[in-house]
Each structure stands twice: as C-alpha cells, then as structure tokens.
C-alpha cells in the first residue's frame, strides 16, 4: 500500500506518468490481494467469519475501502480515488497493528459472539458500511485540503459527486447492518433494540449519512459544505466503531479493549483540521 500510495501521489505532479501509474496500479492490486489472502487465512484457521473482534474489523474495513477505491479507480481513472484507497488500506493495517491487544488476536470468541447466521451477516454488512463511510470521509478530506491549496471549482464538484455516490452505498449497508444487528440481538437476548452504546453508535452513523445526503440532495449546502459534512462523518463513525469499544461497556461491543483514547482524539483532531481547511 505504501509503495502504491507514493507512486500515485508523485504522479499527481507529473505530466508523463503512464509508466508510474502502471506500477502504482500493480502495487495496489498486489496489496489488496495480499490483504484478502490474510483475511482468508484467518478465516481458515479460526473457522469463523472475517470479523470476530476489533482487530479483525479494522482489517476487514480497510480492505473494503481499498477494494472499493481500487475498483472506482480502474473504472474512472481518478488519481485522488486511488491515492485515498491506498491510504485507507495502509492506515487500517497500521491501526490494527497498534491496537491495545496483548498477545493473540485470534483468541476464543465470547459465547454471545459465537452465534449464528444473523451475527455473521450483521458484522459483515455493518463493516462494509463503516468502510464506505471512512472512504467517503477520507476522499472528502482530500478534496477539502486540495481546495485549500488551490484546487479549482471543477475538481471540487467532481469530488462532491463521487463522495455522494459512495455515501449512498454506505447508507445502504449501515442501514442493513443495523437492522440485522437488531435481529441478532433479539435472538441473543430477547430484544431488538435497547439503546446499548454499540446500537447508539450505529444509529448515529446511519443518521449522519442520511442527513449529509439529504443536505446535498435538497441543496441545503454547497459542494464544499457537503464535503465538510462527509469529512466530519468520519468522527461520528469512529465514535460508533471505536469509541464505544474503548468505553468497555455494552452488551455486544466486540472490541473488549481498554486504552487508545490518545489515538482516537488525535484522529478526531486531524479530521477537524481537514474540515476547517474549507474555511
């Protein structure tokens, strides 16, 4: 991911970049395939779905964002999309490596998580949703920072259009994942919704995506304002995903880790700076 990211970023400033883009694309494809192989190996060893704890959720969301971005790049040949795809994959693996786990990341699953079909579908769909939200947020942040350094209005509008479409996908999977989570909760402890911190986090992310899309659809905000909302959506998603796990409470929080607040608030600060670059 790192090599591909460097190649894509350098190519942004070159006129003759065909060969460099070819190498960057090959590196990205190799990284995504190796990422997928790692997930498949964990599934084979554990005989479990790809998402069983906070570590595996980060790894899975990262490959979703990279695969999503890489596919969009191949179809549309937009360099910012490719660069964000590489950055998303690289960041996910770095975060996973530095999570406050001690020892094995493939430990025994808790009894309530060692469950059924509905749990598998819930975690898969909700993590695809979160991965899409973060990809849209990072792409929005890129265009806001690029605007600060002189990107034209045409590039801003193209970026807003791409982010809008990605958020549509994110909204669909966040909604589906939240509903499937309710079905699993009903089967596990007899209630569909109980305002558990994890449930509240998923609902916050879902509502933020919906509000952001409606603000753009109803022309409540400009392209730049829409990108700001999409960028801030990363903070909402990070809280719904990481924050409630780091709190260490809740019935079906799959993180079960302590610590990490420094990195969480560092991420929040960087996202606020990216959004503030629109001012």
Please state what every model-predicted region is.
Residues 115, 151-153:
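Membrane interface segments of multi-pass transport proteins and intramembrane proteases
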């Amino acid at each position: 991911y790192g090599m591909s990211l460097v190649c894509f970023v350098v190519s942004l400033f070159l006129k003759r970049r065909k060969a460099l883009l070819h190498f960057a694309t090959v590196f990205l494809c190799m990284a995504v395939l190796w990422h997928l192989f790692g997930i498949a190996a964990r599934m084979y060893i554990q005989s479990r779905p790809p998402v069983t704890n906070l570590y595996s959720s980060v790894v899975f969301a990262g490959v979703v964002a990279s695969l999503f971005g890489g596919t969009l790049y191949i179809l549309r040949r937009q360099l910012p999309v490719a660069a964000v795809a590489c950055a998303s994959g690289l960041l996910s693996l770095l975060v996973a490596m530095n999570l406050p786990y001690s020892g094995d990341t493939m430990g025994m699953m808790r009894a309530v998580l060692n469950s059924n079909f509905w749990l598998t579908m819930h975690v898969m769909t909700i993590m695809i949703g979160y991965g899409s939200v973060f990809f849209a947020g990072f792409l929005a942040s890129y265009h806001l920072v690029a605007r600060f350094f002189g990107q034209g209005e045409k590039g801003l509008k193209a970026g807003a259009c791409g982010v809008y479409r990605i958020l549509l996908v994110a909204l669909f999977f966040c909604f589906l994942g939240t509903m499937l989570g309710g079905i699993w909760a009903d089967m596990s402890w007899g209630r569909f919704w109980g305002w558990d911190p994890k449930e509240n986090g998923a609902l916050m992310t879902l509502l933020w995506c919906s509000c952001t899309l409606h603000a753009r659809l109803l022309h409540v905000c400009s392209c730049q304002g829409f990108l700001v909302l999409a960028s801030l959506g990363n903070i909402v998603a990070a809280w719904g995903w990481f924050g409630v796990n780091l709190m260490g409470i809740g019935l079906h929080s799959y993180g079960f880790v302590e610590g990490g607040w420094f990195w969480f608030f560092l991420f929040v600060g960087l996202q606020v700076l990216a959004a503030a670059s629109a001012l």
